[in-house]
């Protein structure tokens, strides 16, 4: 196997354990080469296929992991950690999809952040140069050795080999923060959990499951809020789709976060993406489906659909307030939605029933995550078809 090398400048951002030398090879096989016991990066071309890159942004504890499980299920096969690798790896791999956690691009470990007085949300605690270089390489069909941030120890572990998949999902705090990384994305999603719901969820989890006090939970939320407002929240303006989770309007004064109002905000004019609509495209519609065909206990279910603007962009909004009593009855709602990009009648309902134990399966979070997953599958298929058609057209010309 022919291997060529060139020297990387000493200021290069190659991450932990990634030093002076960078290698390229013309086969998918790789081997680790070291000089004077110094580890290095091996990057291998992986054929002519180009990887599709999806970005998912959200704060910690806002449902990214559940969304990833729904998305990989749509493509078939469960996402699992790399076999034989670091047991604390954050990467998930399925037949078609690789999910990279952007925490792996922390440039400071837990102790380093504490010493410098910065949070993981602060750009100064993250290596955006390396993030850009490696996402770009994977998109171009090259394998990379990606660093690992160990959430158990808070340390930066030795890197792991990531081969270019058909679909690369980069999820975390900053997938749309750096304009260079943002420009590499073929589609982007932001999970926008309101402060009220986020607080209610954290209380339910940390008080009920972890024994934390209410005061400590409030202090934790307030400590990270300035950085969240400055660096994470603004990314939603760039997203192609936003799933916004709000307190219900069906129960006056509800603060428990158990019944939710969820909005799917879909940007118009995105290539290979046509927004989902209810009944009549472009109209403004309020629909209460409870009755003979849908079982609804208090407080019921209410849908809304209509056009809107979002950060100056034309968008289509689909909203669900309330929750399902019986998931099998979701087929009635599905039959009134269009542009779902399903392969067969009832696929949304089937996916929801398949993962009814996932958080949010009885409300709009699970429904809209599933719908976005189906839309991403359709976008992927259209992108692949367009790339296949382009060389054929050039040959005929």
Swiss-Prot record:
GO terms for molecular function: ATP binding; phosphoribulokinase activity. The keyword ATP-binding applies. The keyword Transferase applies. It catalyses: D-ribulose 5-phosphate + ATP = D-ribulose 1,5-bisphosphate + ADP + H(+). Its EC number is 2.7.1.19. InterPro entries: P-loop_NTPase, PRK, PRK/URK. Residues 1-44 form a transit peptide. Keywords: ATP-binding, Calvin cycle, Chloroplast, Disulfide bond, Kinase, Nucleotide-binding, Photosynthesis, Plastid, Transferase, Transit peptide. Disulfide bonds join 62-101. It is found in: Plastid, Chloroplast. Light regulated via thioredoxin by reversible oxidation/reduction of sulfhydryl/disulfide groups. Its main location: plastid. GO terms for cellular component: chloroplast. It is an enzyme of class 2 (transferase). Pathway: Carbohydrate biosynthesis; Calvin cycle. SUPFAM superfamilies: P-loop containing nucleoside triphosphate hydrolases. GO terms for biological process: reductive pentose-phosphate cycle. NCBIfam families: PRK07429.1. Belongs to the phosphoribulokinase family. PANTHER family: URIDINE KINASE (PTHR10285). This is Phosphoribulokinase, chloroplastic. It comes from Mesembryanthemum crystallinum (Common ice plant).
């Amino acid at each position: 196997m022919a291997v060529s090398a060139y020297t990387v400048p000493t200021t290069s951002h190659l991450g932990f354990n990634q030093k002076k030398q960078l290698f390229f090879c013309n086969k998918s096989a790789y081997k680790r080469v070291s000089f004077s016991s110094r580890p290095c990066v091996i990057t291998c071309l992986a054929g002519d296929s180009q990887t599709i890159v999806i970005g998912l942004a959200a704060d910690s504890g806002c449902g990214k992991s559940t969304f990833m499980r729904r998305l990989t299920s749509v493509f078939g096969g469960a996402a699992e950690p790399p076999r034989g690798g670091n047991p604390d790896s954050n990467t998930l791999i399925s037949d078609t999809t690789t999910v990279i956690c952007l925490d792996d691009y922390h440039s400071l470990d837990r102790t380093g952040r504490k010493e410098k007085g910065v949070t993981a949300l602060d750009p100064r605690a993250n290596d955006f140069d390396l993030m850009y270089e490696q996402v770009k390489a994977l998109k171009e069909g090259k394998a990379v050795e990606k660093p690992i941030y160990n959430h158990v120890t808070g340390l930066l572990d030795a890197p792991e080999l990531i081969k270019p998949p058909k679909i690369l999902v980069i999820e975390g705090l900053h997938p749309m923060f750096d304009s260079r990384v943002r420009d590499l994305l073929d589609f982007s999603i932001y999970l926008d959990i309101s402060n009220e719901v986020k607080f209610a969820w954290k209380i339910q989890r940390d008080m009920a499951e972890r024994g934390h006090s209410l005061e400590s939970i409030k202090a934790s939320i307030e400590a990270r809020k300035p950085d969240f407002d400055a660096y994470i929240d603004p990314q939603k303006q760039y997203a192609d789709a936003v799933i916004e989770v709000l307190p219900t309007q069906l129960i006056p004064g509800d603060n428990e976060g158990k019944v939710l109002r969820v909005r799917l905000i879909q940007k118009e004019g995105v290539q290979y993406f046509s927004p989902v609509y209810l009944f009549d495209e472009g109209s403004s519609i309020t629909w209460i489906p409870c009755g003979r065909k849908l079982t609804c206990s208090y407080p019921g279910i209410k849908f809304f659909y209509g056009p809107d603007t979002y950060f100056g962009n034309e968008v289509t909004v689909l909203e669900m307030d309330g929750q399902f009593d019986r998931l099998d009855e979701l087929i009635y709602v599905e039959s009134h939605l269009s542009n779902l990009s399903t392969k067969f009648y009832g696929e949304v309902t089937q996916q929801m029933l398949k993962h009814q134990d996932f958080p949010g399966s009885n409300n709009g979070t699970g429904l809209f995550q599933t719908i976005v997953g189906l839309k991403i599958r359709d976008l992927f298929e259209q992108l692949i078809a367009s790339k296949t058609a382009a060389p054929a057209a050039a040959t005929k010309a």
